[in-house]
Amino acid sequence: MKIALTHRSALEALSVLAARSDVGNFPRTSLPAGFVSNAGAAQIERLQRAYGLREPIQTLSCAAASRRGRGTLERHRFNPVSMAQGFIELEPAVFASSPELCFIQLCNELDIVDAIRLLGWMA
């Protein structure tokens, strides 16, 4: 399974991660070259339980053809090269946007509490 969580889904996963440990202990990374998300339904359900993700799960899609999603997925198209060091690897092959990238992705829809939480992680 390979998946990159973005937007609200990444923020939810980072919140769970922060409750378990220090998000700062997780180094920033870039997505592997040629990264394509290939998580199946059972794997997505496991991530929902593990990280408290609400539907739709927001993920990165590098190719237009792979943007077609299941009802539980909302895919966002990005050029990962422009987001070097913009991800945190939560577990092998499961990435989430870094707090800084989450802030950029969500700045128009964050409430004040989530904005402050993100700013705290970025400090």
Annotate each predicted stretch with a short phrase.
Residues 1-123:
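Short gly/ser-rich loop at a beta-strand->alpha-helix junction or flexible surface loop bordering the NTP-binding
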